Amino acid sequence: MSNHWLLPENIADVLPSEARKIEELRRRMLDLFRTYGYELVMPPMLEYLESLLTGTGHDLDLRTLKLVDQLSGRTMGLRADITPQVARIDAHLLNRPGVTRLCYAGNVLHARPAGFHATREPIQIGAEIYGHAGLEADVEIQELMLAALTAAGLSDIRIDLCHAGILEALLAGLPSIRKIEDALFAALETKDVPALRELTAGMPQTERDALLALPTLYGGVEVIERARATLPASPAIGRALDELAALAVQVRGASVNIDLSDLRGYHYHSGVMFAAYVAGLPNYVARGGRYDKVGEAFGRARPATGFSLDLREVAALSPVEVRALAIFAPWDADPALRAAIAGLRAGGEIVIQSLPGHTHELDEFNCDRQLVRKDAGWVVVPR
């Protein structure tokens, strides 16, 4: 007999206690974004593939679930990342001059899980600034990311900083690098120095030495000065290190690390990149950076920076307790009781009315009060 209740691998239901926490954090974060002036957008779950993947890297293509549209015959994709969709909205639909701040929250689907235990259906929430090329926008986004994690109750946060411009400058004079690009990125991300030695054999010595040095350029902000002494003294690398130094001093409420080989998302980032970690966990809980080139694919190149996180992951780490206080009410046909319940609910109270025969069943709400008949009416008293 088949098990009709089975779900695909790395797909799971969200049960009430987890769903309450996820929804609480979603509301907290969206309300937080609104206090900074971010406007909510809701891109579609499904788009034509060429639109969904425009301006993105090969990694997003591999993570995108694809199907054929029965109306048009064209290939469509279920979004694996909302960020490119928001870039499309800014570039093509809003078409505003000046600065635009947008935020979003929604499910995404991954054809492959990011890790062994990772969900293939994250709930992505994030914020983006378009139209300002200065580091001030990156500072605001980084501040907002930390505020969102703090709103979720997380503490002891570390920010790792990197810059896509450093690797871009090192590879600019090496057109043949495209053949080994993916392997090179993988070796840098995992700090696999033996693999790097093999991959860089035959490269010009200056670039090779710099690439081999990147995995060692990890640690506190003093790494920036070590990088200045170790890497080629090109204007592009100098600017990138200056930006990292300026961003590092702006971090409040978190420790700062520099990791010049943390290049996840390099294909679509164009400047500073940052990731947030919490103590005791090897994987980041939020990630962001600058991606000025994404809007160009939609016909409007705009400076852009943003961050995102998975609400399901953050909810699993969050100490926030979301067990709502409620009022217990008996089942009674008395119109006065119905009026009392309606008035309490209109005022924002949770009122749970027991059904006949189920008065003593427990639920996940904390009914600390109850409605009782008193004189000719109904009143709320402690339970």
Curated annotation (Swiss-Prot):
Pfam families named in the record: tRNA-synt_His
Taxonomic lineage from the root: Bacteria, Pseudomonadati, Pseudomonadota, Betaproteobacteria, Burkholderiales
Chain's role: Required for the first step of histidine biosynthesis. May allow the feedback regulation of ATP phosphoribosyltransferase activity by histidine.
Listed NCBIfam families: hisZ_biosyn_reg, PRK12292.1-1, PRK12421.1
Membrane-crossing residue ranges in chain numbering: none
Superkingdom classification of source: Bacteria
Protein name: ATP phosphoribosyltransferase regulatory subunit
The protein's annotated pathway: Amino-acid biosynthesis; L-histidine biosynthesis; L-histidine from 5-phospho-alpha-D-ribose 1-diphosphate: step 1/9
Location of the protein in the cell: Cytoplasm
GO biological processes: histidyl-tRNA aminoacylation; L-histidine biosynthetic process
Keywords: Amino-acid biosynthesis, Cytoplasm, Histidine biosynthesis
Source organism (scientific name): Cupriavidus taiwanensis (strain DSM 17343 / BCRC 17206 / CCUG 44338 / CIP 107171 / LMG 19424 / R1)
One Gene Ontology term of the molecular function aspect: histidine-tRNA ligase activity
Family: Belongs to the class-II aminoacyl-tRNA synthetase family. HisZ subfamily.
Subunit structure, as described in the record: Heteromultimer composed of HisG and HisZ subunits.
Main localization, broad class: cytoplasm
GO cellular component, one term: cytoplasm
Extra remark: This function is generally fulfilled by the C-terminal part of HisG, which is missing in some bacteria such as this one.
